[in-house]
UniProtKB/Swiss-Prot annotation:
Lineage: Bacteria, Pseudomonadati, Spirochaetota, Spirochaetia, Spirochaetales
GO molecular function, one term: structural constituent of ribosome
Keywords: Ribonucleoprotein, Ribosomal protein
The family this protein is said to belong to: Belongs to the bacterial ribosomal protein bL17 family.
Organism: Borreliella burgdorferi (strain ATCC 35210 / DSM 4680 / CIP 102532 / B31)
Name of the featured protein: Large ribosomal subunit protein bL17
Keyword tRNA processing among UniProt keywords: no
Length: 123
């Protein structure tokens, strides 16, 4: 039995967990803010921070590496042109988690994940 993994399994199989995280990260970059349970958002935060760090250097290699995880061209372009330029001087801590309290139905800890700074308005 493997113990002390470097991530939370979220009570899902690996393919389901990967699909969940991929969809949540894409929604996060699309809306710049998402609300969910605290444990899910901790995992989303880890992925989002890694992707933003990778997107700070706009090369063909980095675009191809991120396109493995983000399949939507518009979201990928938004990440490279609007979100990552804001964080060029920052070496980490691109997101903020605001705790909301417990959910009524099952008392799960809820939170909001958002970007620390607002993305650029490129028109």
């Amino acid at each position: 039995m493997k113990t002390k993994l470097g991530f939370n399994r979220l009570s899902r199989k690996s393919s389901h967990r990967r699909a969940l995280l991929k969809n949540m990260v894409i929604s996060f970059f699309k809306h710049e803010k998402i609300s969910s349970t605290k444990t899910k958002l901790f995992e989303v935060k880890r992925f989002a921070e890694r992707l933003i760090t990778r997107a700070k250097v706009d090369t063909v290699h980095n675009r191809r590496e991120l396109s493995k995880f983000i399949h939507d061209k518009h979201i990928l372009n938004k990440l490279f042109t609007k979100i990552s330029p804001v964080f060029r001087q920052r070496s980490g801590g691109y997101t903020r988690m605001i705790k909301l309290g417990k959910r009524y139905g099952d008392a799960a800890e809820m939170a909001i994940l958002e970007l620390v700074e607002k993305p650029l308005k490129v028109e």
